[in-house]
């Protein structure tokens, strides 16, 4: 081999080391990167497809729709959570408690829509953005000796708001009007039982902790809820946590239901959190991992039952 030829060869090899090899590595790295992206994208869409096809699971609505409806000349507001799809779906009317600003109940909305239920949170008169006077202010205006009776009177009047909410829900194209449940916590549990006296065509009643905070001090309320259980027009599942303010609602109303041979179940769960309020409102609104499967099983049974 000629010396100049060898020299040229070494120079060419140096050029290849400087340019050709890095260029090849860059191309190779890009090919690997794009293959990786395609693989990840395929896995994502396959996972999304499997999730969409899974039985009993729906894509949860990220935000509810704020709606307006009327009750007794008052403009009431509420929040409507809907599963993905056209429906018609079974639905739940959720009765909030005594809080001034009930909100949209996002934990419950997500839970129920993921299981293919429309979830409606109507705000009764004087609460949230709804017109009217706040029930707690009206109770406080009564003489102390009359407050227990006054609270029951006001609760009875607010049943009209729940019925208006139910009628609004039945009018929605996404809702199956023959598969509606009424539920709620605390004051909302009271509303659930009082509304359940009416023959409104609902499939079930699921009261959480009805009157538990005021039970011991309010004999008129005790008597009224006993009567509501006697007159109930739908099966009842009453739920409380062991550290609620009082477990008397479960015990007294269960005894009455058994005596009258009503379609009634009650369940007391282990303590939730550390305080009475944790076991009361916290349990109702955020412990879906504790009571959720039991409620869904109860609702499924009632949805299948013939009226």
Where are the regions a protein language model picked out?
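N-terminal cap/lid segment of alpha/beta-hydrolase-fold proteins
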Residues: 61-85
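Primarily recognizes the serine-hydrolase "nucleophile elbow" in alpha/beta-hydrolase
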Residues: 160-231
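Alpha/beta-hydrolase active-site loop
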Residues: 140-172
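The feature captures the conserved acid-bearing segment of alpha/beta-hydrolase catalytic domains
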Residues: 204, 210-265
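Bacterial N-terminal signal peptides
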Residues: 46-55
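C-terminal catalytic histidine-bearing segment of alpha/beta-hydrolase fold enzymes
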Residues: 263-307
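Alpha/beta-hydrolase
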Residues: 95, 122-124, 208, 269
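Short substrate-entry loop that stabilizes the transition state in hydrolases
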Residues: 87-89, 97-131, 214-215, 246
């Amino acid at each position: 081999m000629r010396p100049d030829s060898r020299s040229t060869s070494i120079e060419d090899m140096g050029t290849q080391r400087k340019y050709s090899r890095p260029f090849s590595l860059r191309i190779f790295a890009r090919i690997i990167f794009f293959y990786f992206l395609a693989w990840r994208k395929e896995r994502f869409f396959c996972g999304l497809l499997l999730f969409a096809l899974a039985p009993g699971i729906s894509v949860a609505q990220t935000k509810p729709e704020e709606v307006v409806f009327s009750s007794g000349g008052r403009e009431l507001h509420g929040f409507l959570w809907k599963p993905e799809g056209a429906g018609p779906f079974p639905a739940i009317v959720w009765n909030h408690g005594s809080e001034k600003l009930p909100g949209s109940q996002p934990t419950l909305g997500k839970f129920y829509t993921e299981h293919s239920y429309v979830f409606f949170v109507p705000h009764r008169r004087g609460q949230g953005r709804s017109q009217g006077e706040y029930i707690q202010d009206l109770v406080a205006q009564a003489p102390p000796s009359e407050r227990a009776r006054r609270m029951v009177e006001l609760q009875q009047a607010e049943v009209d708001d729940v019925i208006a909410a139910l009628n609004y829900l039945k009018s929605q194209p996404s809702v199956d009007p023959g598969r509606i449940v009424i539920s709620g916590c605390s004051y909302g549990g009271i509303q659930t039982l009082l509304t359940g006296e009416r023959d409104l065509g609902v499939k079930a009643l699921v009261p959480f902790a009805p009157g538990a905070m005021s039970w011991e001090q309010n004999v008129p309320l005790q008597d009224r809820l006993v009567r509501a259980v006697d007159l109930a027009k739908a099966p009842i599942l009453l739920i409380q946590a062991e550290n609620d303010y009082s477990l008397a609602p479960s015990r007294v109303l269960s005894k009455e239901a058994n005596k009258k041979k009503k379609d009634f179940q009650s369940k007391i769960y282990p303590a939730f959190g550390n305080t009475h309020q944790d076991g009361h409102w916290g349990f109702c609104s955020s412990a879906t991992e504790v009571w959720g499967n039991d409620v869904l099983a109860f609702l499924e049974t009632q949805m299948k039952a013939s009226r």
